[in-house]
Amino acid sequence: MPARTSRRTFVRTMAAAGAAVGGMSVAAQESGRVAGFDHVALPMQNVEAMLAFYRGLGFPMNETPNVVSVYVGSQMINFHRPTLWQNATFTLRAPAATPPCGDLCFVWEGSAAALSSLLARLPAKIEVGPVERQGGRRKGGSSVYVRDPDGNLLEFIIYA
């Protein structure tokens, strides 16, 4: 004779099966989920050149003695100054990260001509592009790639 299952166990089992079919774990249903990125952090070497470059792109910034926060919409990039990332006591970082270690993609809302003009004024040499790419929005766009003064790879994607 099969063992009797409590109603609570049965309901949890059915919820888990339904969640698995729907692609979401029971833990995610019960306790929350990751909703997106808040910020990324990168070490920077050429501080003044980096500040001028990202200001030239039009990003608002907040400077502190150890970190420069560059705001991109509702997210930010924290650039760690050399005084921070070269300090052996600072451990809340990727231990082997040194400039250039970033590969970032920005969404450009404007024409390809306006982007090319801005990049030329910085100046930022286009390394590749325009090329068709699949972006984080799960649809195609046209991208160009440049490097910032530290050598981090920056992609600018224009969604169709």
Task: Give a label for each model feature.
Residues 1-18:
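N-terminal secretory signal peptides and thylakoid transit peptides that target proteins
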Residues 21-48, 102-104, 160:
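N-terminal beta-strand motif that seeds the catalytic metal site of vicinal oxygen chelate
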Residues 36, 66, 73-75, 100-102, ...:
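Residues that flank catalytic or metal-binding motifs in active/ligand-binding sites
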Residues 44-49, 99, 103-150:
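Vicinal oxygen chelate
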